[in-house]
């Protein structure tokens, strides 16, 4: 009977920005537990620009949750998606492992100029909104030109966080939502960089499960989902 139920379960495929990894997993679990009919939700995490390209090329997703508003709007303009919506506001954080001698909480972005810092991880600005936001704050602070040769680029913001966790970089500019995740919480020191990334989504035009996609989009706006997002620093205003 269980095998039959799984076989008959509706399926929802979500293309989601990497900063959502832990928050969205919690939201999916909460949503799935409330369903009366079998529902299989499959999130695929990556850089928003890469997911955007996959959807353009026909990847079978139902919902796109980007780390910006640009990519969803471009999909809609190209006829690949409909029904734009805002669901979160992301923030940048400067993060170092607990073992680092850098006092990032006190020094903030000036930590990046410390002589001990040889590699600084950011997400690739070519296709990751968090990478573009990192470059923007570095330029605004007037230190981008000084540290540009020290930058190492992660494929997405989650990989960027891994670089710093594993010693591939001395310090990283990553998503606050990842800093607050179970795998990073209490394992490092961070400075929240004044920033805000409006994060938007859309329903993919080719979705074969539009009604299910619309229901999940509705849940993202619920008090329960907003509470989960807020716990990861992703509260929308």
Where are these regions (language model features)?
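Exported/periplasmic ABC-transporter solute-binding proteins
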Residues: 9-36, 40-45, 49-59, 66-69, ...
């Amino acid at each position: 009977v269980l095998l039959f139920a799984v076989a008959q379960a509706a399926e929802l495929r979500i293309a989601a920005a990497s900063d959502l990894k832990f928050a969205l997993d919690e939201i999916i679990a909460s949503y799935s537990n409330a369903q009366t009919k079998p529902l299989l939700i499959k999130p695929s995490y990556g850089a928003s620009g890469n997911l955007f390209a996959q959807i353009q090329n026909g990847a079978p997703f139902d919902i796109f949750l980007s780390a910006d508003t640009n990519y969803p709007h471009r999909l809609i303009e190209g006829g690949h998606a409909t029904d734009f919506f805002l669901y979160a506001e992301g923030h940048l954080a400067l993060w170092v492992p607990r073992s680092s001698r850098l006092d990032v909480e006190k020094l903030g972005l000036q930590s990046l100029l410390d002589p001990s810092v040889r590699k600084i991880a950011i997400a690739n600005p070519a296709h990751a909104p968090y990478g573009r936001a990192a470059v923007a704050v570095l330029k605004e602070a007037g230190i981008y030109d000084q540290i540009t040769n020290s930058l190492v680029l992660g494929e997405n913001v989650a990989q960027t966080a891994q670089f710093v966790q594993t010693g591939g970089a001395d310090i990283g500019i990553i998503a606050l939502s990842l800093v607050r995740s179970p795998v990073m919480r209490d394992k490092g020191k961070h400075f929240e960089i004044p920033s805000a990334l409006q994060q938007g989504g859309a329903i993919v035009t080719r979705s074969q499960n539009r009604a299910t996609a619309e229901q999940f989009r509705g849940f993202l706006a619920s008090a329960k989902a907003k509470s989960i997002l807020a716990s990861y620093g992703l509260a929308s205003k």
